[in-house]
Curated annotation (Swiss-Prot):
GO biological process: one example: photosynthesis
Protein name as it appears in the record: Cytochrome f
Gene: petA
Cofactor: heme
Cofactor detail note: Binds 1 heme group covalently.
Signal peptide extent: 1-27
Organism encoding this protein: Synechococcus sp. (strain WH7803)
One CC-aspect GO term: plasma membrane-derived thylakoid membrane
GO terms, molecular function: electron transfer activity; heme binding; iron ion binding
Length: 310
């Protein structure tokens, strides 16, 4: 029941926020959740990159190894210059939001809150986690949340226990991480947002630039054969052409207002067998004891030699 309510609650939060704050700059892992069965394509690309076209650095920190049934932190870092705003849906300057997705190995899940340490509770304050879907509890989403407060997002992760799940085995596992800052350039419907470059629809001369609806500009280009095509530029991007300018098809007619972007990476974690650790510790103890015995034996031998006057 809790898993069912989590995505519904996330949808309610996003829906209310969209209606009440249309000018805010969003990073929407939620949209990927609604449009793709899996957040990762067969090629390895995380689907967020289909809407967030700019590539930006994303980093991740996870322990090298973890024990079964233990809670550890997977930290996703989404660095960017917080002093630079971007263009909101209404054309105003707004601070960037961030979002992240962590695809854990099968069996690894978001740790239950009753197992969070005080440090984890403090580090995750203001962060809401949701599972990608009911049948993928190992895929965890965060966002959108204010980027200036969350350039590092801590994911509390619970490791599985092979002793209670026969499908889980000790060994090395891959973790896929994606991090985004700012709005996308394309909506899931395929339409451009106002956070991207607009280009000339044909080769020709800019015949007119007229005001459109909601602050948009309609740029009309006349081809050499007299054909006219128009491109509607929404409020936000700045025009870089004027009436009478010659343009090539596909050439930019606006600046690029986007300052955000998406990045992904793969990392690894080892689910360590505690018996091997105990065996290793016992081996180290045996080696240390053997060295001590050798030292004591050597000193005893030296004393005997000294007593015999050798």
């Amino acid at each position: 029941m809790r898993r069912l309510l989590s995505p519904l609650f996330a949808a309610l939060i996003v829906g209310v926020t969209v209606l009440t704050a249309p000018s805010t700059s969003w990073a929407y892992p939620f949209w990927a959740q609604q449009n793709y069965d899996s957040p990762r394509e067969a090629t390895g690309k995380i689907v967020c990159a289909n809407c967030h076209l700019a590539q930006k650095l994303t980093q991740a920190e996870v322990p090298q190894s973890v024990l079964p049934d233990s809670v550890f932190k997977a930290v996703v870092k989404i660095p960017y210059d917080t002093s630079v705003p971007e263009i909101g849906a209404d054309g105003s300057e707004v601070p960037l939001q961030v979002g992240a997705v962590v695809m854990l190995p099968d069996g690894f899940t978001l740790a239950p809150q009753d197992r969070w340490t005080d440090d984890i509770k403090e580090e995750t304050e203001g962060v809401y986690f949701s599972e990608y879907s009911d049948d993928q509890p190992n895929v965890i989403l965060v966002g959108p949340i204010p980027g200036d407060q969350h350039q590092e997002i801590v994911f509390p992760v619970l490791s599985p226990d092979p002793a209670t799940d026969s499908n889980i085995h000790f060994g090395k596992y891959s973790i896929h991480v994606g991090g985004n800052r700012g709005r996308g350039q394309v909506y899931p419907t395929g339409e451009k947002s106002n956070n991207t470059v607009f280009t000339a629809p044909s080769t020709g001369t800019v015949r007119s630039i007229e005001a459109g609806e909601n602050g948009a500009s309609v740029v009309t280009i006349a081809s050499a054969d007299g054909t006219e095509l128009s491109e509607t530029v929404p409020v936000g991007p700045a025009l870089i052409v004027s009436v009478g300018d010659a343009v090539e098809a596909g050439a930019p007619i606006t600046n690029d207002p986007n300052v955000g972007g998406f990045g992904q990476l793969d990392t690894e974690v080892v689910l360590q067998n505690p018996v091997r650790i105990y065996g290793l510790l016992a081996f180290f103890a045996a080696v240390a004891l053997a060295q001590i015995m050798l030292v004591l034996k050597k000193k005893q031998f030296e004393k005997v030699q000294a007593a015999e006057g050798v």
